[in-house]
Amino acid sequence: MLTSTMTVTFLGTSSGGGPSTSRNCSSLVADVLGDGSLWMVDCAEGTLRQFQLQPYSADRSNPRLSQVKKIFITHMHADHVMGIVPILRNLLFPVPVGENADKLQALRKPHPAIEIYGPAGIRTFIRSILKMTFTRMSDNYVVHELLASADQATSCDPEVMHPNEVAGADIFCSAGDGLWREVAQDKGIFGPVVVDAGPIIHRDPCIGYVFRETAKPFRKIAVLGDTCDPSAMTALCVDPSPSLLIHEAADAHIPQEIDPKSKRSYDVIKEKALARGHSLPEMAGAFARTVGAQKLVLNHLGGRQASQLKSVRSNVIAEIERQATEAWGMGTARAAWDFMRVAIPSTSPNMPQTATQDELVDHTIPHPVSLTGYPTAYNTWETSDTATSPDPPSYATTASRSQYRVGEGRSTRYSRNAGGFRQHSSQRRGNFDDADPL
């Protein structure tokens, strides 16, 4: 079904120190075309499993792996790329065997079933792993590399390509501003949706992506990779400003009155973050202010911010959001969690939204917090008055409460003891809260 609401679903929100018990490493999927297809940004180890761990949705609105048509990689660090090959193996299906194998292979489409965009090296990375693991698939894929002026193109000679690989494009940046404009394009519900990209400063080469509509309502989603300075993206993030800016906040200074265990000074935290090419929340807020972002979500969160007990953890996340919000000055910033969904509705009167889409925009389930156990499943949240969130977001949601039915999900029961948490029973899991074992 066509929909006029753009959505972004976070599959992994941890920094490179993850995964943790509650956060997978980086990946998100965006529905920007309105036709049900998804564009993925980054694909950490475990991303495939994140599709399976999503909580039950009564209206089946959860993103599905089969919907992924494009993958955009920001940089070549392991916490952003190690899930690509498992995704490809599942999306493109194994080579058929048996008496009908030849007939089935003859039906293989010559054009690629999935397109991958990324920096120099991504083509060799995927090709090498597929070859070394003797992986053969039923459908094809293609890799387009976004190259800086000093980069060398990776050969697409048939002798070196994987059997399922189609020759991709070598897309060099503009000589003037170093940007990649209109690297991809597809038909959206109001007209073409175009992908632009730009270099951002990290300790290694890194790219930020912008998905933008070329017709009204001119929505724009800016997804930055790891960075301590995304200023080169400014030209792509104005006129119009982003409807949604997703910016990393890998570390933050938390005052001791909020977290008594916080011992690092602000200067030490900032120095280390910059040395590693990462941002603090106020840096994310400052860039959001510069480009006039309408919504700001903090992503790629460090383990120090996510692995506290309930009361402290809530206050820490609230403090991270406060720091970014204060620097932004145009709205309330939100810290992402796994399976959080952000909706960007259309303002077109000719495209009325369904009730489910209205719920997606207007309602929110708080970030999961359990006072008595770990973890908590979605079916528990619906009936629990103790599930709380630091200032629940008005535009961020995992799903509306009405989309989950009591009894559909199951949880694993734990109890605290001196050694941490002891498991009593294990069943199908929902979304876990962000508290690590003691």
Which residues make up each language-model segment?
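Conserved acidic residues
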Residues: 69, 243, 294
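Histidine-centered active-site/metal-ligand motif
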Residues: 75-80, 202-203, 247, 275-281, ...
